[in-house]
Amino acid sequence: MCPRYNSSHMIKKLIGRVLSGKLFKSRGKSGAHVIAFKNHGVAREAISTCVLSVTDTLQARGYAAFVVGGAVRDLLLKRTPKDFDVATSATPEEVRGLFRRSRIVGRRFQIVHVMCGRETVEVSTFRAAHDAGADSAEGTDERARTDEHGRILRDNVFGNQQQDATRRDLTINALFYNPATQEVHDYHGGVKDLHERRLRMIGDPVQRYREDPVRMLRAVRFAAALDFEIDAATRQPIRELADLLQNVPPARLFDETLKLLLSGHAVETVKRLRKDGLHRGLLPLLDVILEQPLGERFVMLALQNTDTRIRAGKGVSPAFLFATLLWHEVLSAWKPIEADGIPAIPALFKAMDQVLQLQAEKLAIPRRYGGDMKEIWSMQPRFEQRSGRRPHRLLELPRFRAGYDFLLLRCESGELDSELGKWWTQFQDAGGAERERLLMPESGPKKRRRRKKPRAHGEGASAPAAPSAQES
């Protein structure tokens, strides 16, 4: 458990020391400002016991080992970190040799996962910045590689702690905490930026965005989640370079999009993405949706509900979320297909496939999510069928609850009459007799059952055939 802090007092005290120059214990040999425990208040006990076991083991074997990145940032902001990452001078193979329950993962960026009970600690080796202009007699092509746009394809050039700090993206994510001494090492003024609530890219922002365009998304995500301002020099190139996101593999882009939408600050993130022109590189259909009054209200309601659930510690279905983002594009594609003479339901399925195929070119939505999204969408016309056995059969579907929640969102946004949502709420909560009373009368003449023809060998007519699913 993290110790309790008087956040307001600690932050004011820390800012005063930053501005007066009294914060730092010393400037270390490596060039880092070393901040003593008495000046930041983050105790060793605030770190996960599994992570402490990893850093203690590495340090006992003579390697440097620090807690790095977001965990240090969050602890200094008096937040509870979601997880803890470790950076070390040990190579992946050396780390693997120290921990029996560990494995090396990744190709673009090799790291080691160390398993400790149910916890997995991510351990990375100090990296050096890749010199895109250098070619190598030492096989640098195998350790570091960029594409024609400058995007890093492989990043396994090892270095020292200072080099590792310099190759990180934002100053606030380039802080190192030593659990043994309880000191924070700050190479790029990250602590000052934290307390001035500023996001600043390390190095030349244009070059850093070319190396990894996802850094633009990360800057916007952190700005929304932390309620920070993006430094002018860091913000300025974003709109101009947004097209570089087209070169990012769709699977990686999907992962980053999921982080954006499940951050608990999705509404603010989408607003910032639109402001910086980044949504066009992520969800090419989103701009069209948000230009439609009903579509914008629907999407924003979905994101607000998502933020509320996440902040309350409740689970969220990524499939449901993406189904809401793309629903109005499905609607827009559905009606023209139906107008071409294709029956309503086949036309709906064709529209779903079109929208998902177009989206797949930018964002690799996993098949398991795509299947769930189609189930949610395909249920929507069936909610309008409130007679006979159809409502009972709809209730039995495994994804009924997701489809029902989706229906309520459509009603709340004004797309459908709220009476339909209220009816389904009553119907699912009602008992048997009450459900029968709620059912609507069948529309149109009742279809006659067809009887099979008598058998040819004189065995008499067979029993009447059971009604088809369409008839019942």
What spans do the regions from the language model cover?
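Catalytic cores of the polymerase beta-like nucleotidyltransferase superfamily
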Residues: 2-472
